[in-house]
Amino acid sequence: MKNFLFKKNKYLVSFSLGSVLSLILPPYSYTALGFLIFPTLLYLLFANRDQTRKSIFYIGFLFGYGYFLFSLYWITYSLNFDDNLAILKPLTLVVLPSVVAIFYGLASMLIKNTITNNFYFIVVFSVALSTLDFLRGNLFFDFPWNLFAYTWSWSLESLQILGFVGTYSLNLFTIFIFCLPYLALKHFHYKKLFIVISSIVFTLCANFFFGQNTINNNNLKKIPNFKVVLLQPNQKIIDLTLANNEEQYVNRLINISKPKMHKDTQALFVWPEGILSNLDNSKNYKKLFYDNFSNNHNIVLGSVRYEGNKFYNSLVLLNNQAEILSSYDKINLVPFGEVIPFYNLLEKINLKKITFGYGSFSKGEKRNPVTLNINNIKFLPLICYEIIFSGSIDTEQKEYDFILNISEDGWFNRSIGTIQHFVHSKYRAIEQGKQVVRSTNQGLTSSILPNGRLAKTTDFANQSSIVVDIYKLNKKTLFSEFENTIFYLLTFVSCVFIFLFRKTNE
């Protein structure tokens, strides 16, 4: 039976393991599956340790393909808005999971010579897989979606460690602890199983109570005399592409904002991504803004900004006369969503980006905090996809009061992708120790406190607005100071352990 499953059908088993593992991610968060899937994967690698590197690569690749196929299928929803793109749906289901899965294949292939049935193998596997996860999210593919660390999103206490070590370090820890039951698989013994289970329970409980203590000891201080009004218009995406609808849409946003209710309050009104089709259009709304907003008000919205033959996905700060006070151009662009890799080549086959129109957005140069002119409060601007980058959302100017994220989650309907996007915001809030406020046209507009607690949110894909206060943590987080350097250090220490273990056992 073992030979049939783990030898003759190794590729099918590997794909199946990855597919089921996708359920550890939000919104399902069946975390316990990780303690079954990872040990089984390690046993599968052990059973095939005498196979070629190519065979080991395919085991890891198919594991990754199953995992990403069932956790990223929702990306095809973004192809529903243009008939010319419908043909890409099957291609998307094959290509995107395949590209990301290559990293898991490489991780498996690289550790072939270390496959054993002991603790050493678990450490090597955890370091290899977490390192390849980091590389695919930061250096080679710019797509850090669906790290295993996001399985803990259901436990606010368990997430407090993010403020100290960050998501990539938690990802390393998650892989490692999921793999521990493997130690009891090869030569099963109740005593060994008891030790493994006790170690897992002790570690998880220690982290939980550490997080609980962190929450209790972190004092949040409210910024006085200041409100943020977050909008969720719930406008159909197809309507937003019609230029003659823009003025009507802006009027609707003002009505939802209800600025006259806050005329004596210092307030920031946050509208979603992609409100204006051209930033120059803002001057058309000078009278409309002046008639509705007061001198106490600033407005943030998303717009396309043109500069010569380049165009940018921008976040813009306006005053109550629709004058541009500041703008930020998006740096992290979505592959095929906002930028077409190898554009000159693919243009010849009539391939365009998912967001409407041909051509690619240009990449912004730098990200700095934006200062409001009503009270000198500063926020860090992030547009949509940029909230998912752990350890690289910050700026050299680290002094800011909160993180502001505008988005358009309507591309992915009411799918798991919309919820996962929201969960990333929670992780960034805890890492940076900053409140995250996010406005999205469709999805989950929300306010997340610096400790990750959800302060306010809208219903899924309903038209509404929420008014929130801004809170600041009484101290900076360790991760906000050192960012992914902490992950580098943990990886280095693990590699030293691996080296010393090999030397000792040679």
Residue ranges and their predicted role:
Residues 214-482:
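Soluble catalytic domains of enzymes that build or remodel membrane lipids, polysaccharides, and related
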Residues 2-215, 414, 425, 440-445, ...:
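Membrane-embedded alpha-helical bundles of multi-pass enzymes
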